[in-house]
UniProtKB/Swiss-Prot annotation:
SUPFAM superfamilies, sorted: Homeodomain-like (SSF46689)
Organism annotation: Staphylococcus aureus (strain MRSA252)
PROSITE patterns given in the database record: HTH_TETR_1 (PS01081), HTH_TETR_2 (PS50977)
Source domain of life: Bacteria
Cystine pairings recorded for this chain: none
Name of the protein in its database record: HTH-type transcriptional regulator SAR2658
Amino acid sequence: MRKDAKENRQRIEEIAHKLFDEEGVENISMNRIAKELGIGMGTLYRHFKDKSDLCYYVIQRDLDIFITHFKQIKDDYHSNYEVMQVSLDYLLQFKIDHKALLQCIEAGNNKLRFYQSAFYQELFYFYYDLFKSDDDIYTKFKTDMLLQALSTRVFDFQIEHRNISIEAYRNYLLNIYLDEVERND
């Protein structure tokens, strides 16, 4: 990418981040970002496919930091129960702190792109290794189902409409996804 194109892209991300922080992700359109920057929509869409794509790049640095700390959990804790409990606490707090951006990313037109993202893959393999069994298909299924339960949409629904506390949400997931032996380690 040319230097001026990189600078334009960085400027777009910075202004979008500022506007999202000030007015909320849901209140800012791609058109508004282009107007704020004094650029055409074509320039904006040359850098980002859609708002979901832009949100992903805006949050990328935070995702990288999250993944670094997330991986450290396996080194710091030893039982599957502790690893899962601490990782869920960390992940759920991240979801709360970045709710609007994550909603935008997960609601994007290209859902497959999110599931292929480095962030999703890191989460998948983190929990896949935790659930590892002789039945690879079952382990993949179990991991995919956990990640669906951890999607922003499902998490928000449970917290806001079912009135489940975050601690209860975490504990329910621990009960569902870890067997009794692992919970009592």
